[in-house]
UniProtKB/Swiss-Prot annotation:
Keywords: Acetylcholine receptor inhibiting toxin, Disulfide bond, Ion channel impairing toxin, Neurotoxin, Postsynaptic neurotoxin, Secreted, Toxin. Its main location: secreted. The lineage of its organism: Eukaryota, Metazoa, Chordata, Craniata, Vertebrata. InterPro entries: Snake_3FTx, Snake_toxin-like_sf, Toxin_cobra-type. Expressed by the venom gland. One of its GO terms (cellular component) is extracellular region. GO terms for molecular function: acetylcholine receptor inhibitor activity; ion channel regulator activity; toxin activity. GO terms for biological process: modulation of receptor activity in another organism. Disulfide bonds join C3-C24, C6-C11, C17-C41, C45-C57, C58-C63. This is Long neurotoxin MS2.
């Protein structure tokens, strides 16, 4: 599995997920500097936090 890893809306960077991390993850939230994005490989889909705008977990290459 490969997942996007950059903190931008348009993302060309991907990484191969290590063993045990078979979910691609993307979280968006607002800070005083504007919208922030986090993308990576995870073992479990985290819960949506109170400050989060959106949360995406998926299991296809570069789906985040």
């Amino acid at each position: 599995l490969t997942c996007h890893t950059c903190p931008y809306n348009t993302c060309a960077n991907s990484e191969t997920c290590p063993a045990g991390k078979n979910i691609c993850y993307q979280k968006k939230w607002e800070e005083h500097q504007g919208e922030r994005i986090e993308r990576r490989c995870v073992a479990n889909c985290p819960k949506l936090g109170s400050n989060d705008k959106s949360l995406l977990c998926c299991r296809r290459d570069d789906c985040n």
